[in-house]
Design a protein with these regions (language model features):
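Catalytic core of pol beta-like nucleotidyltransferases
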Residues: 1-43, 52-57, 67-134
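Short beta-strand->loop micro-motif that forms the acidic, two-metal-ion catalytic signature
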Residues: 62-65
Length: 134
């Protein structure tokens, strides 16, 4: 037996969730553009479920910012997190190029995607098995 939706509640909910997802994606894209303006000499990756494509609507964004040299990692992370807009669920890590060889980092970043490659690391990331050929 089919039960009709109560006054289109289901379709309204689905439209609301779709609008909310689009708004989150726009917040994310704007944040990445801001990161690129602030630290153009970097490579920015997305990893985790959003990079693999198996995310759900409430999944956060996992982002790695790679730099050649990091003077004060904690200070930089705090500065970059302050730029994050409210309502954007995001986990941010900052890594140096040397960190990419660490087995734990390699495992975490496997199947990541490059959002911005200001350091020209694409071939090295591919060689390390961190990005997929797309």
């Amino acid at each position: 037996m089919h039960i009709p939706s109560s006054n289109g509640l289901r379709s309204r909910l689905l439209r609301y969730l779709a609008r909310r997802q689009l708004a989150k994606e726009e917040l994310f894209q704007n944040y990445i553009k801001l990161l690129i303006r602030k630290i153009s000499r970097s490579t920015i990756l997305i990893f985790g479920s959003r990079a693999r494509g198996d995310f759900v609507p409430y999944s956060d964004y996992d982002v790695a910012v790679i730099l050649t040299f990091i003077n004060d990692k904690l200070e930089l992370i705090e500065k970059l997190r302050r730029l994050k807009p409210k309502g954007l669920d995001l986990d941010l890590i900052v890594l140096s190029i040397n960190d990419l060889r660490d087995p734990i980092v390699k495992s975490m970043l496997s199947d990541s995607k490059i959002l911005y490659d200001g350091l020209g690391l694409k071939s090295e990331l591919r060689h390390l098995g961190l990005i997929r050929d797309s």
